[in-house]
Amino acid sequence: MNTNDPVGWHGTTILCVRRDEQVAMAGDGQVSLGNTVVKGNARKVRRIGNGNVVAGFAGATADAFTLLERLEAKLERFPNQLERACVELAKDWRTDRYLRRLEAMMAVADRTHAYTLTGNGDVLEPEDGIIAIGSGGNYALAAARALISVDGMTAEDIARRAMKIAGDICVYTNHHVTVEIL
């Protein structure tokens, strides 16, 4: 996926926020085909790895599910080693003739680490514990970074508020938000 081309990202916003001992992964429910909303309650955030890992995806749905299945297989091979599983998936994604054609991005997190995975072979861990991908990702990221300094807000509170802001701004993001908490 050309991560510089927002056209490939239409239809999703995924946000991961880590604060204190809590991790919240949120995703909106809108699926768009061109300029048309075809579904408003899609579930783009999932628990994987025996429930110890949360993953969110942006991009082509079939491609994202293929990558999610591959990541689950890597987690079975490398239990409790999210970083290693992500690196192994990224290597496969980059070098496999079939996988490298997949157009999706993933945000994955466990209780201690969070990563963005791209088809370019990137496994990126944020410095501030916040990841955002998809068409509304930059809006959600900016909102979450502003809200992280507010005392008394949990990771879930920040994720929900930032997703609302992203949904207010991005036409490819709606307010039907799914949140998974670790």
UniProtKB/Swiss-Prot annotation:
Its function, per the record, reads:
Protease subunit of a proteasome-like degradation complex believed to be a general protein degrading machinery.
> Known InterPro entries for this protein?
ATP-dep_Prtase_HsIV_su, Ntn_hydrolases_N, Proteasome_sua/b, Proteasome_suB-type
The EC code for this enzyme is: 3.4.25.2
Gene Ontology molecular function terms on file = metal ion binding; threonine-type endopeptidase activity
Could you say how this protein's activity is regulated? Allosterically activated by HslU binding.
- The protein, known as: ATP-dependent protease subunit HslV
Provide the top EC class: hydrolase
Q: Its quaternary structure?
A: A double ring-shaped homohexamer of HslV is capped on each side by a ring-shaped HslU homohexamer. The assembly of the HslU/HslV complex is dependent on binding of ATP.
Gene3D superfamilies per the UniProt record, alphabetical = Glutamine Phosphoribosylpyrophosphate, subunit 1, domain 1
Which family does this protein fall into? Belongs to the peptidase T1B family. HslV subfamily.
Q: Which Pfam families match?
A: Proteasome
